[in-house]
């Protein structure tokens, strides 16, 4: 009597497992990047209120706020914004306006709140005036000082924001 083969052979199962392993090896790092990008997007959304305040201040006064430094609320107060520790998010520690050039800085929380790829990272939004209009460029080095050991999160910024 002839026996019919049913099911998969061992080699076929091993090939399927190998293919799944290769797909997982590619997909997991891409997912990690996606999570980091989404968390950076939250920070940029939180900074949009400060961007509006800086633009309105510049339109009315003809200059950016002065006498500001990192970690103090002098600029936030001049712009009518709440203190920097009040502008927070799930992944963002604070948003502050610093320097006499209208730079907006946002710092991400430490892990596990923020993804380890961006934890404690700093993003700077730098305004540039072009004949009456203001454009914004993002980086993570304009506010980086010796007391910040920040990761390079430039690759997680949206393409519309990069310098």
What are the residue ranges of the model-derived segments?
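N-terminal single-pass transmembrane signal-anchor helix
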Residues: 1-51
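Short, functionally important structural connectors and interaction interfaces within domains
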Residues: 2, 18-20, 27, 32, ...
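Conserved hydrophobic/amphipathic alpha-helical signal-anchor segments
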Residues: 33-75, 79
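Periplasmic/extracellular, small/polar-rich flexible segments of pilin-like filament-forming proteins
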Residues: 59-163
């Amino acid at each position: 009597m002839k026996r019919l083969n049913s099911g998969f052979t061992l080699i076929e199962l091993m090939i399927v497992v190998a293919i799944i392993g290769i797909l997982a090896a590619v997909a997991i790092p891409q997912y990690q990047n996606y999570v980091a990008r989404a968390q950076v997007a939250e920070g940029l959304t939180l900074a949009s209120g400060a961007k509006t305040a800086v633009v309105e201040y510049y339109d009315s006064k003809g200059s950016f706020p002065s006498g500001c430094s990192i970690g103090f609320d002098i600029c936030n107060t001049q712009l009518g914004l709440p203190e920097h520790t009040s502008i927070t998010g799930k992944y963002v520690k604070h948003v502050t306006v610093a320097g006499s050039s209208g730079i907006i800085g946002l710092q991400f929380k430490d892990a596990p709140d923020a993804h380890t790829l961006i934890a404690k990272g700093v993003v700077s939004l730098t305004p540039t005036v072009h004949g009456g209009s203001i454009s914004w460029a993002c980086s993570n080095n304009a506010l980086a000082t010796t007391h910040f050991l920040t990761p390079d999160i430039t690759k997680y910024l949206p393409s519309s924001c990069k310098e």
